[in-house]
Amino acid sequence: MLVTQTNGNIEQKMKKTYNLEDSAEDFVWKTIDPDDIWVMDKLILSRKMKYNCGPVGQDVPVPGWYIVRPCVNMLGLGLGAEKLWIEEETYNLTIGNFWCEWFEGKHLSVDYYKGKQMLCVEGHKPEHTLTKWKEWRRNDIHVPFPEILNNLIQRYTWMNCEFIGGKLIEVHFRRNEDFDGNINHFIPVWEGESTTPPKGYTYREYPDLHGRIGAFVK
């Protein structure tokens, strides 16, 4: 069953059948220690990181640009996230979401194994979207393991952390499998686009919930 997002709401369509039940994310949610679920809650994580953030209903301290998204989103992929200018009140926003100061800078996805960095990739996308990425590239940027996660290393050997401008914004108890096989460049292909790969690239099917059907990889 394909889950898609339309006008801010999640709806299910029997359009295509994707295997969502056996994902690494499913396994994590079925087996995670309840005491560690705070890591999956982006509001709690952001508060622990001392960011300017709060739940919908709480006023922002200063007018500005904020990222507003669900506190918990197992499906990932930026579902429900939006960039908003907020003057003060947030009562009119979606219940269950939270707001956080807007960060600028490189968007990095980093895999750690027992606290040691194993992979770092940088994502690029147009400014007008939070979901449709243009590309992801492997690089050699070193990002220190977040100290806030030190006491979890023994229980979760693999962790994937996302950073914007050096700020930790998201944590997953799994690794990034898109770059398996020494892949260095991952270019998403969206519905309606050609699946004929550029010279030197291979096309692979990588369907997701935003209309991505695959990717050119090299």
How should these model regions be labeled?
Residues 1-47, 195-214:
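ATP-binding N-terminal substructure of ATP-dependent carboxylate-amine bond-forming enzymes
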Residues 75-77, 126-218:
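ATP-dependent carboxylate activation and anion-phosphoryl transfer catalytic cores
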